[in-house]
Amino acid sequence: LLFRGYKDMSFPPPPHGLLLAGGCSRRMGKDKSSIRYAGTTQPELAAELLRSRCAEIFLSLRKGQSNATGVENLNVVHDRRKSAGPLVGILSAMTEHPEAAWLVIACDLPFLDRITLDNLLAQRDPTKIATAYRSSHDGKPEPLCTIYEAHARLVLEDFFANDIRCPRKILMQTEPLLLDP
């Protein structure tokens, strides 16, 4: 069975990790990536979670943004488009590494843990556009703790071109694998 370059669908290659830290933090008034939780910054905590689970880890930043504190050693993907938002970061990473699936997490998820990520990876379905958790609050997809498969890029590009730039809305209109928390 061949599908998008994978020879054995039961063992897809590990995804790249993408830590989204390019937001402007307008509501918070300061860069979210500088906030400390349990003595360390959010990007440091998130990068540590991704380290043993991903082939490579990348930090997504907006154009002109300096690297986040504590993760200066990560590869950086700068937004390739003027438009803001997490979809731009995801598409920028997918454009730089089109063959890779991406485990995408936001930098401001202080309660994200290894069990949650391990379950997401164990349940991953590479034949779907994405594997995501379903929100326990409203049942909708949680797009910022999701594995986006490499073949999702063209679908995401199409939504972007049609001015649909909210990853949650995109997942609601496609058929990702949704996991219960």
Language-model-detected regions and their locations in the chain:
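Nucleotide and nucleotide-moiety/phosphate-recognizing core
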Residues: 10-167, 172-181
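N-terminal amphipathic/basic-hydrophobic helices that include classical n-h-c signal peptides
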Residues: 1-8
